[in-house]
Amino acid sequence: MIDLDTLKYENGLILAVVQDQKSREVLMCAYMNREALEKTVKTGIAHFWSRSRKQLWKKGETSGHLQKVKEIRIDCDMDSVLLLVEQVGGACHMGYRSCFYRNLKGEVVGEKVFEPKDVY
């Protein structure tokens, strides 16, 4: 296993791209600190660092829409990670399967899978 200390964190954070393991759809991007990455490796459930709340969070802890991590890949520069996951429910807090549910024109192109008001 790659030593987590050899990764290139910027201000203690590393970018994490989350992708569905089977469909390869990009679900979201978030940041991880070393603790979030360690917890993800240990538990098999995605954990991230909230820059706004300044705290660790387990993806899906409130909604139940967990990300079961099947594989973690490191990019060539060692400054970002790719989580290949089995997504339970939606990844986006707006109710969509992916956070990338709109195109640049503003049109909704993604699948809505839950109503946020029913979950949060």
Swiss-Prot record:
Name this polypeptide is given: Phosphoribosyl-AMP cyclohydrolase
EC number(s) stated in the UniProt entry for this protein: 3.5.4.19
Sites where the protein binds Zn(2+): C76, C92, C99
Keywords annotated in UniProt: Amino-acid biosynthesis, Cytoplasm, Histidine biosynthesis, Hydrolase, Magnesium, Metal-binding, Zinc
Entry keyword Cytoplasm: yes
UniProt enzyme class: hydrolase
One GO term of the biological process aspect: L-histidine biosynthetic process
InterPro entries the record matches: PRA-CH, PRib_AMP_CycHydrolase_dom, PRib_AMP_CycHydrolase_sf
